[in-house]
Each structure stands twice: as structure tokens, then as C-alpha cells.
């Protein structure tokens, strides 16, 4: 605490022995020890009361929990990167007017309609039937 070594304590003891004398030195050491003990207890009581009033333990627990949650989030983000835009989930955009046409189609007359060859409609071989559910309807 005060970084006092053995030699310093020995020097203080010798000075106290010379000043107080051999008769009063044991009583002075005992009284000093009692006062130091009382001061330590009162400081620890004051510290505990202040911490209890301001809720330092609760604040420390909350900060600790927040740190743990932040670390957990960081670990999850490092393991699993944020989901990128899934091209299968987004509907395909309709082709632009000039995207599927050849270069010479731009010189055609405006009344001509040209269907793009890139996306021809698929012929349907099945007849269209309304969707039926095999599950019984709920009352």
C-alpha cells in the first residue's frame, strides 16, 4: 500500500523507542493498531454504503452483461455474415424495350411488334385446373 520495506519499519520502530521510551512504546503501538483497525472498518463501511446507494454492483452487472452480449453479437457476425440479397428471392425484372431486340430492329417501323427471342413463352401442355386442397376445410 505505502511500499514500505522492512528497513523503513525498523527505522520507525527505533525512533519511536527513543522518543517514547520502553515503558510507553507497547501501549502506543497497541493504541495505534486499534485506531488503524477502526479507520479501515469505517472506510469499508462507508464504501459499502455508497456502493449500495448508487447501485454500483447492479451497474457493474449490467455493463458486464452488455459486454457479453456485444461479444456474442460480434461472434455471430463474424461466423455468419449478414445475408446478401438473394437473387432467387427477387422477382425477375421485365426486360427493357430495346434489350432483347437486335440492332437492326431499331430501324423497323413503330407499328411492328417484335417479341424478344431470348424469353419465348413456354407452351402449356396441361389444361388449367383450379387449385384444390386435399385437406378438409376448417369449420
From Swiss-Prot:
GO CC annotations on file: TAT protein transport complex
Keywords per UniProt: Cell inner membrane, Cell membrane, Membrane, Protein transport, Translocation, Transmembrane, Transmembrane helix, Transport
Membrane topology, from the record: Single-pass membrane protein
InterPro entries in alphabetical order: TatA/B/E, TatB
PANTHER family, per database record: SEC-INDEPENDENT PROTEIN TRANSLOCASE PROTEIN TATA, CHLOROPLASTIC
Its job: Part of the twin-arginine translocation (Tat) system that transports large folded proteins containing a characteristic twin-arginine motif in their signal peptide across membranes. Together with TatC, TatB is part of a receptor directly interacting with Tat signal peptides. TatB may form an oligomeric binding site that transiently accommodates folded Tat precursor proteins before their translocation.
Subunit structure: The Tat system comprises two distinct complexes: a TatABC complex, containing multiple copies of TatA, TatB and TatC subunits, and a separate TatA complex, containing only TatA subunits. Substrates initially bind to the TatABC complex, which probably triggers association of the separate TatA complex to form the active translocon.
Protein name: Sec-independent protein translocase protein TatB
Gene symbol of the encoding locus: tatB
